[in-house]
């Protein structure tokens, strides 16, 4: 039995059900979640998860407290890319190819679907341990971009376009 079992589907207005070490904080639709997380990182608890209430995107930013020097913190970018790919793989059909490109782009069947970002607290030395770090993900759920009929942009896709939503 799991601690996180839900007998009924979650209500759309309920906050996400996360492990106790993580604290979800909603961010209104038109605010940049990553920028907000950076702004509050110095005074927030480790494990604070800011998420957008915008239904068009999965947009999250997680505030962390690194235990390694600043130069090694960049490894979290790749960890978040792979974690996002694993989550997409659980939702999308098996024939959907999930690929990545530096610096943090996520592609579904060669179409750009999202990206991951990282920001580390400013410090003077790459060998010092930063006070905080923010990792963020933005993934397009629906492709509701207004497109002129003569300008089809096949380079942009979404989870729904690829059969995963």
Residue ranges and their predicted role:
Residues 98-110:
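Catalytic palm active-site di-aspartate
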Residues 45-59:
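N-terminal, Lys/Arg- and Ser/Thr-rich interaction peptides
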